[in-house]
Amino acid sequence: MTYTLLNKIDDPADLRKLDRRQLDTLAEELRAYVLESVSQTGGHLSSNLGTVELTIALHYVFDTPNDRVVWDVGHQSYPHKILTGRRDRMSTLRQYGGISGFPRRAESEYDTFGTAHSSTSISAALGMALGARTRGEKRVGIAVIGDGAMTAGMAFEAMNNAGVYKDLPMLVVLNDNDMSISPPVGMLNKHLARLMSGQFYAATKKGIEKVLSVAPPVLEFAKRLEEHAKGMVVPATLFEEFGFDYVGPIDGHDLESLVPTLQNIRQRALEGHGPQFLHVVTKKGQGYKLAEADPILYHGPGKFNPAEGIRPSAKPSRKTYTQVFGEWLCDMAAADKRLIGVTPAMREGSGMVEFEKRFPDRYYDVGIAEQHAVTFAGGLACEGLKPVVAIYSTFLQRGYDQLIHDVALQNLPVVFALDRAGLVGADGATHAGVYDIPFLRCIPNMMVMVPADENECRQLLTTAFQQDCPTAVRYPRGAGVGVATQPELTALPVGKGEIRREGHARAGQRVAIMAFGSMVHPALTAAEQLDATVANMRFVKPLDVELVKQLAANHDFLVTVEEGATMGGAGSAVLEALAEAGIELPTLVLGLPDKFIDHGDPAHLLSLCGLDAAGIERSVRERFSLTAQPVKVASVA
């Protein structure tokens, strides 16, 4: 496809030079460009195809970047990036040194607020609007948020706050596409997906009349309903009660409707009519039939041929850790009826699809509500059940107070299965699970386990399930190391590691590497060159202190290695144990540096951080001034 109009647009100022009648053609070109780009790089597709017209309309009507647009979650911001001067860099999307898959302030002045976790946009836009007013500047703060993100309490906390400011130039755009990553849940989403029909309107009005005698304030709602015939009965009332002027729902793919509606809203906002709320209905995957038919499959695809669509790949030779968890969950549920599965809107990503099919009465998707998920699981545990919360490591951060106050303080037996621990690659710093070890191991009653391979992951999940205290099992994204999983539900001894390799270096060069989780196998490879001992520690908490002492007694140097933050991490736990035992021995702590790691290929990122086998070997030699071992070359007859 030729991009006649799109090639003329280097920023929104160029966009605003177009005649309104040209916008539909631009939308066709922009949608085609998004599809072409993502098919070549991989990335988020369905959500971006669904926001093309909305993105065009926002930049056409509002004075960006003076008016601040905040994209909630941000994975739907590719059209925005293309229209704001980054069209020619889309080929670098989510690659090391390339542009991010999410809005990023350091990347463009049009990325007014960095996002990636959900439900933050309204708070940020409110802060921007009030900040501008404090500085005597006139601009509109705009939050674009999906219906899935509206299930999080933070969004409503922000709206409750925003409604207080009756003259604040602020706009919330609800992008109602009836789908977060997994189909959204909860009563709010049921209402958002239910466009008013004549029968629904009549039934609602009749119901209101019945309660007028006990709820006089509802009379005003009935009048508004009849006068304006609003398309969304419950949301209109709900959002207006928060202090917003509600408009909608309107077709989010109809520029003839979007542009004038937004123009009117902008004028009202700048004239001091207070916070505005626009409800648009869009379709994920819009314009690409394969994505329309299966938006979940096309949510975040790798490279593919748009003409053919995503083809089933050959069955991988190695299971992913997510698959290992999903299989274990079903097996344990079959063995123990107390098991309950809980996820905050990550059914597919966390490997719970089969569990939901087999055990629908024991599966709870609580929506994008991590705080609620943690406390909800605590409530289940109070009733003698054994909840397993499947959650990405990075998202557990959002429920930290609940983890401490509602679960650990009461010593409730909740299992936290932490997927995506460590670096995650293309999604970058916002999704990296690198802080879980420090923030978990400092909590009393909490156990923290770190499997080295697929079968050990299954065993440690079983170990966690058998405990009468809160537990966490962290495992990385992607395929394992190729170890077959055994069908038995076998637990491992609590707080005990193992020696995976005995070193035989000469005195003065004896190195012991204590490896945690995903770092065991790189450590084993490095140890071959160092002739070092390698311990698979398995537990961060309780730490195998006896093993630490044993290694210290028989070696000249100690090394810890983990795929996580070193400040307060597993290495810190080892140093604390050594100090408490009064042991002084040169110790090298390896892990991720004290900075945010950008997006890129995971193997490349680990190499840059010195956490591949070569990096581990190099760091050990440099720190302890070890000489290279002579390489034995087999004679050739």
UniProtKB/Swiss-Prot annotation:
Reaction(s) this enzyme catalyzes, per UniProt: D-glyceraldehyde 3-phosphate + pyruvate + H(+) = 1-deoxy-D-xylulose 5-phosphate + CO2
Keyword list, A-Z: Isoprene biosynthesis, Magnesium, Metal-binding, Thiamine biosynthesis, Thiamine pyrophosphate, Transferase
GO cellular component: cytosol
Annotated Mg(2+) binding sites: 147, 177
Pathway as given in its UniProt record: Metabolic intermediate biosynthesis; 1-deoxy-D-xylulose 5-phosphate biosynthesis; 1-deoxy-D-xylulose 5-phosphate from D-glyceraldehyde 3-phosphate and pyruvate: step 1/1
UniProt GO molecular function: 1-deoxy-D-xylulose-5-phosphate synthase activity; magnesium ion binding; thiamine pyrophosphate binding
Enzyme class: transferase
GO biological process: 1-deoxy-D-xylulose 5-phosphate biosynthetic process; isopentenyl diphosphate biosynthetic process, methylerythritol 4-phosphate pathway; terpenoid biosynthetic process; thiamine biosynthetic process
Subunit structure: Homodimer.
HAMAP family for this protein: DXP_synth (MF_00315)
PANTHER family xrefs: 1-D-DEOXYXYLULOSE 5-PHOSPHATE SYNTHASE-RELATED, 1-DEOXY-D-XYLULOSE-5-PHOSPHATE SYNTHASE, CHLOROPLASTIC
Listed name of the protein: 1-deoxy-D-xylulose-5-phosphate synthase
